[in-house]
Amino acid sequence: MEKLSLILLLAITYYNSYSQTDTLFYANVEEKPRFIECKEVAKTQEIQCFKEQMDKIIREYIKSITSQGTCGFIQGRVNVSFCINPDGTTKVLQMKSTDKDWEAITLRIIESLPPFIPAKQNGKPVVVKMLLPIRFELE
């Protein structure tokens, strides 16, 4: 049986600027977007809970495609930039990788994320941009 090892480098990278359309970067927003599972988590644990939930979703997705025999890749890394909208949905903005197959998998993962509790700034839901580096390793 294949052993799956996925390392999620969730160093949620932040840009340090604002746009004119209430789009903020993760580091700059007052209330961070959250998974439903992180709703009751203390503010000091929000980022850790976010990382754990994202890691869990990515692991489950990779396990599902490797169990179907549809993944013939050994390893890969994708840097994906995406936004979480005020309605909690996600939209991929840009991806960088040397392997288009991993980009396609990453796109499906981000598009299949469950709705988020949206980020808020001054009490209003806002768009939040994030950069997520994902490193896949299959053994």
For each predicted feature, which ranges?
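Charge-biased low-complexity segments
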Residues: 5-6, 17-139
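Short, linear, compositionally biased motifs with a strong N-terminal bias
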Residues: 10-11
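N-terminal hydrophobic targeting signals that begin at the initiator methionine
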Residues: 1-2
